[in-house]
Amino acid sequence: MRLRHLTEALPAVLSWTGGDVEIHTVVADSRQVQPGDLFVAIPGVSVDGHRFIAQAVEEGAVAVVGERPPQELGSLPWGSFTYVRVPDAREAWGWLCAAWHDFPSRKMTLVGVTGTDGKTTTVNLVYAIMQAAGLNAGMVSTVSARIGEQEIDTGLHTTTPDPPDVQRYLAQMAETGTTHAVMEVTSHGLAQHRVAGCDFDVAAVTNVTHEHTDFHGTVEAYRQAKARLFEGLASSFRKPGVPKVAVLNRDDDSYRYLSPFPADRHIVYSLSGPADVTAREVHLASDRTRFILALPGGEMQVETPLVGTFNVSNALAAAAVGVALGLKPETIAEGLAAVQGVPGRMERVEAGQDFMAIVDFAHTPTALQQVLQTARTMAQEDGHAPSARVIVVFGCAGLRDRAKRAMMGRIAGQLADLVIITAEDPRTESLDEIMAESAAAATAEGKREGVDLWRVPDRGEAILLACRQARAGDVVIACGKGHEQSMCFGTTEYPWDDREAMRRALQGKTLDTLPTARH
């Protein structure tokens, strides 16, 4: 593909130095450059891609896209490559990857789901609804991508994949005849333009609560990042006969902020107020949820293995997307009922024990509050003793939103009977200091160390302690890691799986893959 043709996709080009050339592929890592490649020099938080232009050209790059003016780049072999200057290299990378694959999202109806909590579950529900409708559907979540019969793991930690992966997944979907796709869109993915060049037709939000102020700086900046998905509806590529629809949560503060963004149609869902999509007669049990789903086209009884009020809200969001796609109520209800569970989301681990053992991804204050409230409901059901307790294991990540540590410690202190604070990706921060911040907040809520509050640095030992403390009817819940397959200490990712750790703990053993383990 010619460079001129590729760069026609860019929102803006500030200057062009050199001639038109044939491009082999688009890369943003100088170590991956092959002869004939276009190298995108992206300024990062700690490393500036402009520093590697010379290396990229030496490896054979014939063109470079960057932000800095040529005169600031110093001595380079200018006659041997073309330099295209843009206002935002990261955004350009997204558009270039989309153009390289001939804008695959324009060949299907694309749904984007964003929000603080519940995105992955909602995406799985939407995908199931599409399948129930007999659509040739695809999905990209922070857990996996599903393309035809193929399922691809999308990474160690949960965020929207980088532009080359996003566009490759969509291109593979287009090649296999996918007509409808749903994508989980994180705030990082939006702020870093990972979905630039993705033309969404439906934008849906679960909720926008406290999260990621370490990255975005302020709650307002975080909210603005989420809003980009809705802001882009009006300017995105129009597909024949496919309307642009915004799906909004009237129960969430984001409703007031997102509802003014223009769309062909706004579909509103709510657990408690007037809306297009609602639920009534909600019955929560420890192993399933029943409710009547009220849609513009009628009412349907829904029964799902997903538990908790928050999952009813996720189901309503997915149902509203189904309405946006013009699907029948019975099809929507069938899809909701088909999802048996989502990896690492209120996932039960069974080994014949007389208490419930659960793994959940809850890693934000709101999510922790919701899962602990649900765990309390579960502990009080099914003939359990009135004294059945909730035992929580959780931690807070290093180099991330510090305010969450006290907030989550306070919530755990209020809502759990026994609190065990442990590691969750401490990175280069002191694990002891992270745990101390959460422990202080739990103590302020009346918890006493050594009585109903413990700090256990090794996560495997923490989960084992929780299981050893459990009595018949109790609920043990390990929060924060969910389906993730690694934990970061320093700058190293160590193999880790909360579900395997829980299975071992139920056998009286520990998963000892972390540097905190006692060997």
Residue ranges and their predicted role:
Residues V62-R68, V245-R250, V393-F394, D417-D425:
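Short internal beta-strands
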Residues M1-W95, A99, A275-T278, Q301, ...:
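N-terminal leader/targeting and accessory segments in enzymes
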Residues G66-P69, V185, N207, R250, ...:
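Short secondary-structure boundary segments
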Residues G49-A61, Y83-D88, A92, D201-T206, ...:
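A short, gly/pro- and small-residue-rich
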Residues M1-L14, Q32-L38, G44, D48, ...:
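ATP-dependent carboxylate-amine ligase
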